[in-house]
Amino acid sequence: VARGDVKLNPSQNAAMEAAMSRRLTIIQGPPGTGKTHTAVATLAQLAREGRGPILATAESNVAVDNLLEGLLNTGVRAVRIGRPVKVRETLRAATLDAQLEDHPKQDEIAIIRDETDEVHRALPKLKGREKGLAHRDIQRNKKEIRRLENEMIQSVLENAEVICSTNIGSGHRMLDGRRFPIVLMDEATQAVE
């Protein structure tokens, strides 16, 4: 039915079809009936249809990791925001932090940091105007690093079909101004707010 051939039983398939065709859908059922499995299949299908970017959330880190793992197994480009130490070890490569570490702009940032360190080391020997110019260069470099880091974050998020986060994490400032035509909340009954 979805990318990666996620197999659904008839009731799961009906739930997925409802979720894809209605503005709001609640899927409920006892534990172990495949609600998360259905959520993953739905997200994969929506991603395949290009209906993103999609925000997928859950109250707990474990539940978010389950969504992320299912999405990655179906070939969806998903990224996990949040603290990497809270993410299952096998999924860390899909975290925003891990993808930023491997980003091509890191080389440019390293050069600027080296240059800034060099200026810092020279500061005690400088006086007057030279010292003022050195401080200006340090501030300029810090600003450039922040700009590059923000560009990296935006490029990773823009490349993702699905952004996964805890409910609390979905309020992070890095998502400010970002519009999600589709939001899926797994285990919504556990949400505190």
Regions found by a protein language model. Give the residues of each.
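Short hydrophobic/aromatic beta-strand immediately N-terminal to the Walker A/P-loop
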Residues: 25-26, 55
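Walker B catalytic acidic pair
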Residues: 187-188
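N-terminal pre-P-loop "Q-motif" helix
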Residues: 5-23, 38, 165
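Conserved P-loop NTPase motor core of helicases/translocases
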Residues: 1, 44, 50-57, 63-183
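Motif I (Walker A/P-loop) of helicase-class P-loop NTPases
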Residues: 36-44
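Walker A (P-loop) phosphate-binding loop of P-loop NTPases
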Residues: 32
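Active-site-adjacent beta-strand anchor residues
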Residues: 9, 57-58
